[in-house]
């Protein structure tokens, strides 16, 4: 079975890294104690007043993480260039806090410049969307959901990354909510008004949630994120390390409007083409939490990706919405790049669309959205 994004590490390496981290315990390096922890009572749902805000909600900051040689090997230099480029672009619009292992923090500061705050926190990898907390807003301000990151079902070393959510919440002094399921932030997309989109392949999966049914997981999602409607697409198991995250397929630009990553005309068929077709059918017939049908906007993938590898993520839908900006990938297909930028300008009026070359991330099977996690303003 081919696993993209990063090839699974050898078991010996995983064991060695995990063992070393286990000896470290949960020391917080002197960070202040968090405000506390919030339980998620069964059936609490939106009645408790907590909700997942949409990504366009104003941000306090963006969190990112610095890639490590342990995971990326000889490719780490190019990947770090991409991360620095994204961090600098986002920092033009809002504060960026980039987590880095202490010994690598000076190099991260040099690469990113003074406009990016580098925070020494142990990390394994760069995918902050998945390892970081997912923030929710409610009557008591803000809380962070810890989804118990487990390396996408144990596919990669994650001893440090499994503690990243707690470390961020401790540092921000934000209440932690321990989820009753295992998932990643990239597996959940919300419109900010009670509707979620998820892929079944990455959630109803024994490598994250053994013994839990789709109904069990849906109840947990509704309780955690204040949702009343969950739209499920099938996705694809075992074809990429995430088991197919929704944020590489479909995004809400606003309530009732879904941006759908669409294969280029005449693109060869594969497992992901079938997943797209199934998702499109679901979305065209779905209704949101308001009981309204969705408007599906196609965001065509590039037709020409040159000599890039088979696992390359050529997906414009993996963009990031910052304060006053949309940060999107650029792939070198001038027509597709231009069309995608124009579509996003129409969908996000008043925001600057910034397009960046991030081919090293793409070769790893991820993108800009995968590498970022927003901290929303509590208002």
Name each model-derived stretch.
Residues 33-379:
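The feature marks the mature, well-folded catalytic cores of soluble enzymes
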Residues 1-16:
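N-terminal secretory signal peptides and thylakoid transit peptides that target proteins
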Residues 22-23:
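C-terminal motif of bacterial Sec signal peptides marking the signal peptidase cleavage site
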Residues 26:
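Short, conserved catalytic or interaction motifs in soluble domains
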């Amino acid at each position: 079975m081919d696993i993209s994004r990063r090839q699974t590490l050898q078991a010996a390496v995983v064991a060695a890294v995990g063992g070393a981290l286990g000896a470290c315990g949960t020391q917080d390096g002197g960070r202040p104690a968090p405000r506390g922890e919030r339980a998620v009572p069964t059936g609490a749902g939106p009645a408790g007043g907590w909700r997942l805000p949409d990504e366009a909600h104003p941000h306090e900051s963006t969190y990112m993480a610095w890639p490590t040689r342990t995971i990326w090997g000889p490719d780490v230099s190019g990947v770090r260039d991409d991360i620095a480029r994204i961090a600098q672009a986002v920092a033009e619009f809002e504060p960026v806090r980039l987590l880095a292992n202490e010994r690598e923090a000076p190099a991260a500061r040099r690469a990113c410049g003074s406009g990016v705050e580098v925070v020494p926190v142990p990390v394994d990898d760069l995918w902050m969307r998945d390892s970081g907390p997912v923030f929710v807003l409610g009557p008591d301000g803000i809380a962070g959901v810890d989804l118990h990151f487990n390396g996408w079902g144990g596919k990669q070393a994650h001893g440090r990354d499994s503690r990243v959510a707690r470390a961020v919440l401790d540092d921000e002094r934000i209440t932690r909510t321990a989820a009753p399921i295992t998932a990643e932030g990239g597996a959940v997309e919300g419109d900010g008004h009670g509707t979620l989109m998820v892929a079944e392949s990455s959630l109803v999966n024994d490598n994250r949630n053994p013994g839990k049914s789709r109904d069990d997981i849906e109840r947990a999602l509704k309780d955690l994120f204040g949702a009343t409607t969950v739209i499920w697409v099938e996705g694809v198991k075992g074809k990429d390390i995430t088991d197919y995250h929704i944020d590489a397929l479909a995004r809400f630009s606003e309530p009732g409007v879904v941006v759908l990553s669409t294969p280029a005309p005449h693109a060869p068929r594969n497992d992901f083409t079938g997943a797209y077709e199934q998702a499109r059918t679901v979305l065209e017939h779905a209704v949101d939490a308001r009981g309204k049908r969705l408007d599906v906007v196609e965001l065509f993938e590039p037709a020409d990706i040159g000599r890039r590898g088979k696992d390359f993520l050529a997906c414009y839908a993996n963009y990031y919405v910052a304060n006053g900006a949309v940060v999107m990938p650029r792939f070198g297909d001038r027509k597709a790049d231009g069309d995608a930028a124009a579509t996003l300008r129409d969908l996000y009026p008043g925001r600057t669309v910034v397009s960046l070359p991030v081919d090293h991330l793409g070769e790893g099977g991820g993108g800009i959205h995968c590498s970022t996690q927003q901290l929303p303003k509590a208002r």
